[in-house]
Amino acid sequence: MAPPPPSADVPLAERLQRLASTLQFAWFSGHALLLLCVFRYAFSWIRFNYYSGMARFCYRFAFIAAAATYGIVVYKTWRARQKTGVKTSGIKDYLRDENIQYLVLALVWLFMPQYPLALLPYGIYSVFHVATYVRANLIPTLVPPQRINAPAGASPNAKPQYTQHPASEAIGVFVKKYYDSSMSMVARLEIMLWLRLILSVILFQRRSWILFAIYTTFLRTRFSQSIHVQNAFALLEARIDNLIGAQGTPPQARQVWDNVKTAARQFYAVTDLNKYESGVAAPKKSS
C-alpha cells in the first residue's frame, strides 16, 4: 500500500528533509545528474568538442550515475527478497534482472573508449524515471494534495481520494503518451549501437572485440525479454529484405544476406537457455 501524501500541516523544510533522506531520492538524484551530463556532453558533441576535459568528465560521470541508480534498485530488490525470504534459483535469475544487466553494462561503458550512442538509452530511461518521481514524490511534497470529501453514503473504510496538481496530471499524460514509443526508440538505438560495434571490429579499433562480445550477450538477453527489441529486429530484417529483394540486386548480395539470417537464427537457437532448462539437453559428442 502506498503511503499517504505529505500533510500541508508539516513545514516545507521538514517535508523536503524527509524526502531527501530516502534511498529513492538518491536514485532520483542519480537520474537527474545523468540527464544533466547527457545534455552537457551532447552540447560538446554538437560542437565537435567531445574529447575536451568537460566532455570526457560528463561522459564518464553519466555512467557513474547510471551504475549508482541501477545499483540502488538492485540493492532494494535484494533487500526485499531477504525480508520476504524469497530465494533465487541461481545466478541465472540475477542475469535475467534487467536492472543488473544495465548496471553491468554501465560499468563496461565507464571503462571503455567513448561511444556517444551508448548514452542515449540511459538518457531516455532517465527522462521517464525523473518524470515519474517528480509526479509521484516531488510535486506532492512541494504542494501537498487536498483530500477530497467522501460523498454521502460512502463506506467509511473506503480509500481516501486526493486532488492532483495540474503539473502531475500533465506529467502523467506525457508518460502514458510517449512511454511505448520511447522504449521502441531505445531498442532501435541499442541495435544501432551494436552495428556501430561491428564496424569497430572490422576496423580493429581498441578493445572492440571484447566490447562486441559483451554487448552481443547483453543484446541477446534483451531480445529474449523485450518485445520492443524483438520488433526492432523484425523491422530491420523487413527493411533489408525489401532492399535486397529490389530488382537489380546482385545474386551474391542476396546470398550473403540469406547466410547472415541463417547464422543469426542458429546463434539464437544455440544461445536459447530456455530449451536447456526445460530438459532438452545439448547433444553429446560421440566418443
From Swiss-Prot:
It is a multi-pass membrane protein. Keywords: Membrane, mRNA transport, Nuclear pore complex, Nucleus, Protein transport, Translocation, Transmembrane, Transmembrane helix, Transport. Its main location: nucleus. It is found in: Nucleus membrane; Nucleus, Nuclear pore complex. One of its GO terms (biological process) is endoplasmic reticulum tubular network organization. The gene is POM33. The lineage of its organism: Eukaryota, Fungi, Dikarya, Ascomycota, Pezizomycotina. Residues 1-18, 75-103, 205-287 are cytoplasmic. Residues 40-53, 125-183 are perinuclear space. This is Nucleoporin POM33. It comes from the Eukaryota. Belongs to the PER33/POM33 family. It comes from Chaetomium thermophilum (strain DSM 1495 / CBS 144.50 / IMI 039719). Contributes to proper distribution and/or efficient assembly of nuclear pores. The chain crosses the membrane at residues 19-39, 54-74, 104-124, 184-204. Signal peptide: none annotated.
